[in-house]
């Protein structure tokens, strides 16, 4: 499926991010913020991953699809802790290669499938999964509702889906909305809210949590960890990129503290269609 120029640029940036994320310095920061022990760019913390595993009722009989799986966090962790089979799907191949090697190192390759693919057109012809998860993925995609429809198509009728997402608070002034967009993922904007999207695409809401405060804590931890490792980060990235990154974190946290953005956790189940 053809990507727009902006989507291609996003993929190229992610490929580079996964390369850099393998650095021991970045790993130390990631572990400090998320407590995960995995290469990755997801904001999911270990406690959040455990919560998602419970919401999805994962066990050794479960088949999990992780969309936007990156380098395997938290999908590999969910599989390791629950014993389920996980299919990791994403577009950037660098992250998937890292995930594949991690699965081999953890001796769980027999329960891990790694696929390069676009969530707008999932490569499965029948309902194949008992659970679907994605972490801060929809806010990085243009075709959000199309992806939700595809998730609905490939999940069992009794399945569960859990996902986190960053979104812009409603009813902002033009100036505040512009400020929110500037510090958000590439495609954070949407014509309708996520509850409406879910209703439109065949899902019913089971549980909802506003996890904005937890995200703000993660941002603060990130800024502190980078401050502690400033010298190493300057050597790794260069002083200009370090300063740009520092300013970006400050602006992001400022927008969240101002109430312009939120991070949400949705747990849903498919609406059963009438025969």
Q: Which residue stretches match the model-derived regions?
A:
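Conserved alpha-helix/loop element of class I SAM-dependent methyltransferases that forms part
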Residues: 42-60
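Conserved Class I S-adenosyl-L-methionine
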Residues: 209-275
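Class I SAM-dependent methyltransferase SAM/SAH-binding core
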Residues: 63-121
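N-terminal, positively charged/glycine-rich alpha-helical extensions of SAM-dependent methyltransferases
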Residues: 1-33
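A short acidic, Gly/Pro-enriched loop at the edge of an enzyme's catalytic core
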Residues: 120-131
């Amino acid at each position: 499926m053809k990507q727009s120029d902006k989507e291609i640029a996003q993929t190229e940036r992610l490929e580079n991010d996964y390369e850099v994320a393998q650095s021991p310095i970045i790993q130390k920061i990631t572990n400090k913020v998320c407590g995960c022990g995995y290469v990755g760019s997801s904001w999911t913390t270990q406690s959040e991953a455990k919560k998602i595993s419970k919401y999805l009722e994962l066990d050794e009989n479960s088949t999990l699809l992780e969309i936007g799986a990156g380098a395997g966090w938290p999908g590999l962790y969910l599989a390791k802790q629950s014993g389920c089979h996980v299919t990791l799907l994403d577009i950037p191949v660098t992250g998937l290669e890292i995930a594949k090697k991690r699965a081999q190192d953890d001796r769980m390759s027999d329960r891990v499938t790694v696929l390069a693919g676009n969530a707008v057109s999932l490569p499965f012809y029948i309902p194949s999964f008992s659970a679907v998860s994605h972490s801060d993925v929809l806010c990085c995609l243009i075709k959000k509702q199309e992806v939700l429809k595809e998730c609905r198509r490939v999940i069992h009728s009794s399945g569960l889906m859990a996902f986190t997402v960053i979104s812009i608070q409603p009813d902002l002034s033009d100036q505040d909305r512009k400020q929110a967009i500037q510090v958000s993922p590439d495609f954070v904007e949407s014509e309708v809210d996520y509850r409406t999207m879910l209703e439109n695409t065949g899902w019913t809401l089971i549980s909802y949590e506003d996890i904005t405060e937890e995200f703000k804590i993660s941002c603060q931890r990130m800024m502190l960890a980078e401050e502690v490792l400033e010298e190493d980060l300057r050597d790794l990235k260069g002083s200009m990129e370090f300063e740009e990154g520092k300013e970006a974190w400050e602006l992001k946290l400022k927008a969240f503290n101002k109430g312009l953005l939120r991070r949400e956790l949705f747990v849903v189940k498919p609406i059963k269609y009438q025969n």
